């Protein structure tokens, strides 16, 4: 299958581990400052993708090529130099045995050469995750990485420049009965600086959630405790979301 998309058709695997009863808390509400890898379906990216038919072990593979869709890539007045960047992305989903699902994604950027700036490091990243369902419980584990673009001129500022981010997620969801589901999720994001002596502070999030079906409505409650928001020591917060959804 060939797809042509703008700002959609994403293949990001950063949340594939998550078994939250309601939602990914780090993706809604207050920003926790966690840096995640990008994907072909991100906003302002035009992408062409090829998705294979289903292969053995319920495996599908996707290959994508993306560009930004701002003025720098069109016949209008030039935008910023980053608008000429492009991305190559490869992703995979597989279910080799009953209950087990595997996900993986990797991408790298081809930096636009403007003849002025030089990248010491072009952006690259990706992630992988595994989930396993047994009875009423499903557990998930995943990791994602992002190495941001770094200009050659800031290499000397290695003590304050992050070389890459490493994110780890663990989650368990349990269906107590046909109406009630509960979950616990933990996420950690670690910044790794170009200078190893630099002290970094991990963002840590713990979330508990429940969802209860009331016939045509579902009541959901989600709470998250977060430490070191934005990788800043002792910048903590607690967030609670209460939601009611209706089926018409």
PLM-predicted stretches and their roles:
Residues 1-248:
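Outer-membrane beta-barrel proteins
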């Amino acid at each position: 299958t060939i797809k042509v998309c703008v700002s959609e058709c994403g293949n990001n695997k950063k949340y594939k581990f998550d078994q939250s009863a309601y939602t990914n808390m780090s993706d809604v509400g207050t920003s926790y400052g966690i840096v995640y890898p990008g994907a072909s379906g991100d906003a302002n990216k035009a992408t062409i993708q090829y998705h294979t038919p289903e292969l053995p072990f319920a495996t599908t593979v996707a290959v994508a090529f993306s560009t930004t869709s701002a003025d720098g890539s069109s016949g209008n007045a030039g935008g910023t130099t980053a608008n000429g960047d492009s991305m190559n992305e490869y992703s995979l989903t597989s279910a080799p045995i009953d209950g087990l699902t595997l996900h993986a994604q990797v991408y790298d950027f081809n930096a636009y050469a403007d003849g002025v700036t030089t990248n010491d490091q072009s952006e690259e990243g990706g992630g992988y995750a595994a989930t396993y369902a047994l009875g009423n419980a499903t557990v998930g584990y995943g990791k994602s990485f992002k190495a941001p673009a770094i200009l050659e001129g800031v290499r000397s500022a290695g003590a304050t420049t992050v070389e890459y981010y490493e994110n780890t997620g663990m989650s368990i969801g349990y269906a107590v009965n046909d109406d009630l589901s509960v979950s616990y999720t933990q996420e950690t994001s670690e910044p790794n600086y170009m200078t190893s002596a630099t002290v970094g502070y991990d963002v840590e999030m713990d979330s508990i959630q429940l969802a209860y079906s009331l016939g045509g409505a579902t009541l959901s409650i989600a709470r998250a405790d977060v430490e070191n928001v934005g990788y800043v020591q002792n910048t903590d917060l607690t967030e609670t979301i209460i939601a009611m959804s209706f089926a018409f």
